[in-house]
Swiss-Prot record:
UniProt catalytic activity: 3-O-(beta-D-GlcA-(1->3)-beta-D-GalNAc-(1->4)-beta-D-GlcA-(1->3)-beta-D-Gal-(1->3)-beta-D-Gal-(1->4)-beta-D-Xyl)-L-seryl-[protein] + UDP-N-acetyl-alpha-D-galactosamine = 3-O-(beta-D-GalNAc-(1->4)-beta-D-GlcA-(1->3)-beta-D-GalNAc-(1->4)-beta-D-GlcA-(1->3)-beta-D-Gal-(1->3)-beta-D-Gal-(1->4)-beta-D-Xyl)-L-seryl-[protein] + UDP + H(+); 3-O-{beta-D-GlcA-(1->3)-[beta-D-GalNAc-(1->4)-beta-D-GlcA-(1->3)](n)-beta-D-GalNAc-(1->4)-beta-D-GlcA-(1->3)-beta-D-Gal-(1->3)-beta-D-Gal-(1->4)-beta-D-Xyl}-L-seryl-[protein] + UDP-N-acetyl-alpha-D-galactosamine = 3-O-{[beta-D-GalNAc-(1->4)-beta-D-GlcA-(1->3)](n+1)-beta-D-GalNAc-(1->4)-beta-D-GlcA-(1->3)-beta-D-Gal-(1->3)-beta-D-Gal-(1->4)-beta-D-Xyl}-L-seryl-[protein] + UDP + H(+); 3-O-(beta-D-GalNAc-(1->4)-beta-D-GlcA-(1->3)-beta-D-Gal-(1->3)-beta-D-Gal-(1->4)-beta-D-Xyl)-L-seryl-[protein] + UDP-alpha-D-glucuronate = 3-O-(beta-D-GlcA-(1->3)-beta-D-GalNAc-(1->4)-beta-D-GlcA-(1->3)-beta-D-Gal-(1->3)-beta-D-Gal-(1->4)-beta-D-Xyl)-L-seryl-[protein] + UDP + H(+); 3-O-{[beta-D-GalNAc-(1->4)-beta-D-GlcA-(1->3)](n)-beta-D-GalNAc-(1->4)-beta-D-GlcA-(1->3)-beta-D-Gal-(1->3)-beta-D-Gal-(1->4)-beta-D-Xyl}-L-seryl-[protein] + UDP-alpha-D-glucuronate = 3-O-{beta-D-GlcA-(1->3)-[beta-D-GalNAc-(1->4)-beta-D-GlcA-(1->3)](n)-beta-D-GalNAc-(1->4)-beta-D-GlcA-(1->3)-beta-D-Gal-(1->3)-beta-D-Gal-(1->4)-beta-D-Xyl}-L-seryl-[protein] + UDP + H(+)
EC identifiers of the protein: 2.4.1.175, 2.4.1.226
GO function term, MF aspect, one: glucuronosyl-N-acetylgalactosaminyl-proteoglycan 4-beta-N-acetylgalactosaminyltransferase activity
Entry protein name: Chondroitin sulfate synthase mig-22
Keyword Transferase carried by entry: yes
Length: 804
């Protein structure tokens, strides 16, 4: 009470003193003060006009006012947004598609009047190149083949003309999907798609125009039997005024004439065969009634340049005419493309030479391709692979040579043929002998480059030509002077990257997915490694952290395991669960009863995963671990993020430990220094002969003396349950395998991710391969992995060969 009173006294005194000072310096009448202030302000503002609204007081007359507003900065704050239910601002109506809002459209649409079976041929030839082809047919003329087309719109005339129905259907189709150009034609007219696409790429579409062949009566309308090309503004006018055609239609006019008149009346445009320097070319070689069919006359027509430039060829009689014309125009277009390529290559060579002169650098080959990439350091230098016609030498740590087969053989054979053609075209007198050497390298900017050394045989004449009266002596001397020599030719071949494709974006992945770790224990020799794995996992929980993700540790026990071993594993699982309680770790022992022998790891893994998916469901990640695995905590996070449902499975490349006796890991570093080399070698050989179980005395680290990353080891992988069930259907229930990688290969929807995983290590163990596996590649893969994981080559050499 006393302390609060003392504080309040000071506050009250300060308030009273401030009020007294305010009353002393300022007037107590607010109206007078306001009037004086306003008078002073208006006096300053009206100095130029010398008119004062209010008379300033004596105090205000003595004050001097300065204008400081020129340095002011005006800040305009946005008004607060009103609630959603009180927003009276009209909202902008957005279009559904960005293409509609931006005004982007497809280039051309072809509308074909289907009257016979020729419509199928026109649809097949034109539809491969034009963005949109649509057929319109009278329902009474549609047969079974025509009815199967998805781009067909049938109609019923009901006493009306064809144009009224077709234009009505076109109006409905172009309300939302518009085009720059519209082609109207009959199915008896062949349209050259290559000429059509070049025409629309050359002309501007925003001018109303109707292109085609004008009628002979001079009316100015375009003929429908030779086709007509309408720009987007012309088609827009046709759609808006299409109903006016009915007022001018005559009953005596046929459908084609009525259609032509309707287009002329509705668009109010005259037919133009020439527009912006582009001509609408029509070939009338088969116009007469007695003219042969088009497919019989192509050999005569192809000599005419006008035929090669033709856009429309009317009066087709059969499907053979359309197919023959299309095949011919495809050949013409390919020849034109070849000429353009040759012209472009010459231009690129000229530009490359010009750039080389300006920069002072060497000319890259082939022209227009960037030179070889310069490596940033010596560790990233591109490695050339050496090959012959039977073998391929790769840059691999443990395998130097492989047989040339499969796609590699096809690649080398094609390159050798191309190199031979180049050499033999320049020197036809050479006789090919063999491929001597070959090298290849991949550059991501250039493609695949090859250097091919070819051996040829050449016959030369060593005797100079002299005049001799005896012809027989000349022939004998000439034969003696002939000599075969060996000629070497080196050819550089480049296989450029023809096309690139962006991969589909991978789905979004989160790291909070539940994981079920499955450890199959198929025999007694797997019990001790599995218990060591559980003990290492328990040590990871010595410093537990709060974990929101659930991890389930499951040991799959097979019938061959003794009961005391099962009891020991169960006790270890209980201890693991107790130590990792804060990490949301669950444990379980799963009895498995396979139908076949589990000698192969793949068979045991399949049986364990089958029962695990049945018990725990298919909507979680299953991480299969070998009993001999040694994993770190980070490995589970990578398994979560690299396993994607319905998209990707994760097969890590583990670090496999070498035999500790051969690699010298049974001795500590101090013992290795104190023990002579020969004595250590003899001791290692003795332990190997006696079959002593190796015991590592050093920490297993990722180093080349301790082991290797085995790319042929597929014993550990992560997969979603639903993806495993889908892949499991490829295998029979009684099939024996060494691994399960082949189940996920060859699937379009599932990707296989392989990555080197330093946090996954496989302890050394005597690996057994099931020789009764149904897959020969599976057996070969297991045997190769078993041999290469014994030790490094230098370690084996030091052990087997005594250094003198």
């Amino acid at each position: 009470m006393v302390g609060g009173g003392r504080t309040g006294i000071h506050l009250l005194l300060g308030f009273l003193i401030g009020a007294a000072l305010a009353l002393f310096f300022f007037s107590s009448t607010p109206s007078i003060d306001l009037t004086s202030s306003l008078a002073a302000f208006t006096s300053c503002q009206n100095q130029e006009t010398e008119t004062n609204v209010l008379e300033p007081s004596a105090l205000e007359k003595g004050r001097v006012y300065k204008d400081l507003s020129e340095h002011w900065i005006v800040h305009q704050d946005d008004m607060p947004a009103p609630p959603h239910n009180q927003d009276a601002t009209p909202k902008v109506t957005r279009t559904r598609f960005a293409a509609t809002e931006l005004g982007t459209r497809e280039r051309v649409m072809a509308a074909v009047m289907a009257e016979s079976a020729l419509a199928l041929s026109i649809n097949a030839t034109l539809g491969r190149h034009v963005p949109r082809v649509h057929l319109f047919a009278d329902s009474s003329r549609i047969d079974n083949d025509l009815a199967q087309l998805t781009n067909l719109s049938p109609y019923k005339l009901n006493g009306q003309k064809t144009h009224s129905m077709v234009l009505g259907l076109l109006f409905n189709m172009t309300v939302h999907n518009n085009y720059d150009w519209f082609l109207l034609a009959k199915d008896s007219t062949y349209i050259n798609p290559f000429v059509l696409l070049r025409m629309i790429d050359t002309m501007n579409w925003n001018e109303p125009v109707v292109m085609g062949e004008a009628a002979e009566d001079g009316s100015g309308r375009c003929r429908l039997d030779t086709g007509m090309l309408l720009s987007q503004p012309a088609m827009h006018a046709l759609m808006n005024n299409r109903n006016a055609c009915n007022n001018f239609a005559l009953a005596a006019d046929d459908d084609q004439l009525a259609f032509e008149k309707c287009i002329q009346i509705a668009t109010n445009l005259t037919c133009k065969p020439l527009h912006q320097g582009v001509r609408y070319e029509v070939w009338r070689g088969a116009e007469r009634a007695d003219s042969p069919a088009a497919h019989d006359s192509i050999e005569d027509w192809k000599h005419s340049p006008a035929f090669k430039r033709a856009l429309a060829v009317p009066r087709l009689l059969s499907d053979a005419d359309a197919s023959a014309l299309h095949d011919y125009f495809v050949r013409v277009e390919m020849q034109r493309a070849d000429r353009e390529i040759i012209k472009m290559e010459a231009e690129l060579s000229r530009l490359a030479e010009q750039e080389a002169r300006e920069t002072g650098e060497a000319i890259s080959w082939p022209p227009a391709l960037p030179p070889y990439a310069k490596p940033p350091n010596r560790y990233q230098v591109s490695t050339w692979e050496y090959f012959t016609m039977t073998e391929l030498f790769r840059s691999e740590p443990n395998q130097n040579v492989r047989r040339l087969e499969g796609k590699d053989f096809d690649d080398v054979a094609e390159v050798v043929v191309a190199a031979r053609q180049q050499v033999e075209s320049e020197e036809p007198e050479l006789e090919f002998v063999q491929l001597r050497n070959g090298y290849r390298v991949f550059d991501p900017r250039r493609g695949m480059d090859y250097m091919v050394d070819l051996t040829y045989r050449k016959t030369v004449n060593e005797m100079p030509e002299v005049d001799n009266r005896f012809e027989s002596d000349n022939e004998a001397a000439h034969e003696e002077s002939l000599k075969e020599i060996v000629v070497e030719r080196r050819v550089h071949v480049s296989r450029m990257i023809a096309s690139t494709q962006l991969m589909n974006q991978a789905p979004y992945v989160k790291e909070d997915t539940d994981v079920t770790v499955v450890i199959p224990v198929a025999s007694e020799k797997d019990v001790l490694p599995a218990r060591k794995l559980l003990a290492r996992q328990a040590r990871l929980c010595l410093f537990p952290t709060e974990e929101a993700r659930k991890t389930r540790m499951v040991v799959a026990v097979f019938p061959l395991i003794e009961s005391r071993s099962v009891t020991a594993i169960t006790n270890d699982m209980e201890e693991l669960k107790r130590r990792c309680k804060r990490s949301l770790l669950e444990t379980d022992v799963l009895p498995v009863h396979p139908a076949v022998s589990t000698e192969g790891k793949g068979t045991a893994a399949a049986a364990a995963l089958d029962d695990a998916v049945d018990r725990y469901g298919a909507n979680t990640i299953y991480l299969l671990l070998s009993p001999h695995a040694d994993v770190q905590k980070e490995f589970f996070d990578r398994a979560r993020i690299n396993t994607i449902k319905h998209y990707q499975v994760f097969f890590p490349v583990p670090f496999v430990e070498y035999h500790p006796t051969i690699s010298g890991m049974e001795m500590t570093e101090k013992e290795e220094k104190e023990t002579p080399t020969e004595q250590a070698r003899e001791a290692a050989l003795s332990r190997l002969r006696d079959g002593v179980e190796p015991k590592r005395k050093r920490t297993l680290i990722v180093q080349k003396e301790h082991g290797r990353f085995d790319s042929q080891d597929f014993s550990c992988f992560a997969v979603y349950g639903v993806d495993y069930v889908t892949a499991r259907a490829k295998f029979g229930q009684n099939e024996r395998r060494n691994d399960l990688i082949s189940a996920f290969l060859g699937q379009d929807s599932i990707h296989v991710l392989r990555a080197v995983e330093p946090t996954l290590r496989i302890r050394y163990h005597k690996r057994s391969c099931d020789m009764e596996s149904i897959d020969t590649e599976d057996i070969a893969r297991c045997l190769d992995s078993k041999k290469e994981n014994v030790a490094a080559k230098d370690q084996l050499a030091k052990l087997l060969f005594h250094e003198k």
